[in-house]
Design a protein with these regions (language model features):
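Short beta-strand edge/turn micro-motifs at domain boundaries
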Residues: 1-2, 118-143
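A solvent-exposed, acidic/Ser-Thr-rich amphipathic alpha-helical stretch
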Residues: 14-15, 33-93, 117
Length: 143
């Protein structure tokens, strides 16, 4: 048994992961690609890119592919509204956390009517040399 895998995170770490996600939510609604770039993990030199976005309709592997996806959706209507009271940060180890947030997303292509959908957003945050960063984004539609 790997005892380290069951180590708890500090209350400060839990707050930092939560704050990172809320920063992401604000950046998405503001269509701020620079902040989105800052919250995604960067691989250490010589290591594989840990960033991915896996949805029912599509997948994106790597930071640049994920950022390109957000650049595309930011061209239209995009609002990202997590239910902060229902958010959960679940430690998976001292340097990894699962973040869960029921979220309302309003989306629409530029010049087209937008629609609102409910998702159960699941993300993995990892501790990096630069602090906590997002490595995986998995939005699960509720319907």
């Amino acid at each position: 048994m790997n005892v380290r895998a069951f180590s708890t995170m500090s209350p400060e770490d839990l707050r930092d992961v939560r704050a990172l996600f809320l920063r992401q939510a604000a950046a998405e609604t503001a269509h701020d690609i620079e902040v989105m770039d800052s919250i995604l993990a960067r691989p250490p030199a010589g290591q594989p890119d840990p960033v991915n976005f896996v949805a029912r309709a599509y997948t994106f592997w790597g930071r640049e592919a994920v950022l390109d996806h957000f650049r595309a959706v930011f061209a239209g209507t995009w609002q990202f509204e997590p239910d902060e009271d229902a958010m959960r940060v679940i430690p998976l180890g001292p340097d990894t956390a699962h973040l869960y947030a029921p979220t309302r997303i309003t989306a629409g292509a530029a010049g087209q009517p937008a629609a609102t959908f409910q998702f159960l957003v699941n993300e993995i945050a990892i501790r990096t040399a630069d602090g906590w960063r997002i490595s995986a984004i998995v939005p699960v539609p509720t319907k």
